[in-house]
């Protein structure tokens, strides 16, 4: 058996990683691989009635609960973990200091695959997180950069999760992974982020009064909206799914998480593609 994969997902906020690739994380963990979610910020600005340390502590606890649900669903406690950095929300910048943080995180975890958002995004924290990952890509191999943390011998493959932004160019998927079998786990992971999906985001959209009070009713309300987006990823990558899984299975996929490879990461070959994405065998 080959060495387990090490999958590093870097987002700006303590719900970004699981929101975009939570299903993929569970699939990897179920196969014996290790997944780490990293939030560049502590999330201390994302609310309308609380902030600062209480919100940061709340959001870290939410993230840890989401990771625990993923690990439990994989049957491997600790196989999905969440690291939350103590940088202020809405204040992430592509500074040298922050680049060094990302370089050290990548070196210490030794990822085979790094996943983040594209640099084309509405939120400055998202844009700059993407830039920090790209800026760290080559320098993880340079011994005299962050010299006290042993450098990597290779540049890991980097991929972007899916989005709907069109300029300067639209998201162009290179791989799309079916998440039907874990989609309900993903919904339960996202439901851990109460401060976001049941409070801040509905408030910011003028829909706070629509949120049900009961836990199961809230989950049903949230999932009814989120599952449409999850299904849209499958519909948008239908041809790719059919090619990867075969026409019969690919055309039957309901939910998917697509990725686009970043040209600043390591090269993707037929051999390492098969190792990095061990999901496309016979149904």
Q: Language-model segments: what does each one mean?
A:
Residues 98, 125-133, 154, 182, ...:
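Internal, well-ordered alpha-helical segments in soluble enzyme and binding-protein domains
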Residues 1-109, 131, 139, 279:
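Active-site rim/loop-helix segments in enzyme catalytic domains that contact anionic ligands
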Residues 47-50, 169-173:
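Short acidic, glycine/proline-rich loop/turn micro-motifs
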Residues 105-151:
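Active-site adenylate/phosphate-handling loop in enzymes that bind or generate adenylated species
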Residues 80, 112, 156:
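Conserved acidic residues
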Residues 153-163:
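Extended hydrophobic secondary-structure segments that form protein cores and membrane-embedded regions
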Residues 2-5, 144-147, 152-154, 168, ...:
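C-terminal accessory domains and tails appended to enzymatic cores
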